């Protein structure tokens, strides 16, 4: 049985404070990342927190991309989940580079296959 989807979860450290705190920049980055991976965008929702931080989601026909940013720590958690033949690493790599991540820890989980098994773990 083929996997129903691939879920990339990344911990991004050493990111640029201003980028992590700029909702418009993050929204554009996530929309661009989805399009670069070949996804079809359905909905986009982002929220700016006070005094800082952004959370958001891009819903795609193939699943979703999400972020929670913590500029005061230079940190962002991102998820890119795709179903079908899309490669979620294309979007995740694009996002990490756009945010200026100095360190990145990533796991990729196959989805819809039964018990979770970590397929890969890598760090920048």
Swiss-Prot record:
Keyword Lyase part of the UniProt annotation: yes
Post-translational modification summary for this protein: Is synthesized initially as an inactive proenzyme. Formation of the active enzyme involves a self-maturation process in which the active site pyruvoyl group is generated from an internal serine residue via an autocatalytic post-translational modification. Two non-identical subunits are generated from the proenzyme in this reaction, and the pyruvate is formed at the N-terminus of the alpha chain, which is derived from the carboxyl end of the proenzyme.
Top class in the EC scheme: lyase
GO cellular component: a single term: cytosol
Record InterPro entries: AdoMetDC_C, AdoMetDC_fam_prok, AdoMetDC_N, S-AdoMet_deCO2ase_core, S-AdoMet_deCOase_pro-enz
One Pfam family of this chain: AdoMet_dc
Keyword Cell membrane: no
Catalytic activity, EC: 4.1.1.50
Domain of life where this protein originates: Bacteria
Record-linked Gene3D superfamilies: 3.30.160.750, S-adenosylmethionine decarboxylase domain
Active-site residues, Swiss-Prot/TrEMBL: 63 (schiff-base intermediate with substrate), 68 (proton acceptor), 83 (proton donor)
GO molecular function: adenosylmethionine decarboxylase activity
Positions bearing the site annotation: Cleavage (non-hydrolytic): 62-63
Pathway: Amine and polyamine biosynthesis; S-adenosylmethioninamine biosynthesis; S-adenosylmethioninamine from S-adenosyl-L-methionine: step 1/1
Reactions accelerated catalytically: S-adenosyl-L-methionine + H(+) = S-adenosyl 3-(methylsulfanyl)propylamine + CO2
GO biological process, one term: spermidine biosynthetic process
Cofactors required: pyruvate
Cofactor note: Binds 1 pyruvoyl group covalently per subunit.
Pyruvic acid (Ser) carried by residues: 63
This protein's UniProt keywords: Autocatalytic cleavage, Decarboxylase, Lyase, Polyamine biosynthesis, Pyruvate, S-adenosyl-L-methionine, Schiff base, Spermidine biosynthesis, Zymogen
Listed PANTHER family: S-ADENOSYLMETHIONINE DECARBOXYLASE PROENZYME (PTHR33866:SF2)
Known partners and oligomeric status: Heterotetramer of two alpha and two beta chains arranged as a dimer of alpha/beta heterodimers.
Family classification: Belongs to the prokaryotic AdoMetDC family. Type 1 subfamily.
Physiological role: Catalyzes the decarboxylation of S-adenosylmethionine to S-adenosylmethioninamine (dcAdoMet), the propylamine donor required for the synthesis of the polyamines spermine and spermidine from the diamine putrescine.
NCBIfam families for this protein: SAM_DCase_Bsu
Protein name in the entry: S-adenosylmethionine decarboxylase proenzyme
Gene that produces this protein: speH
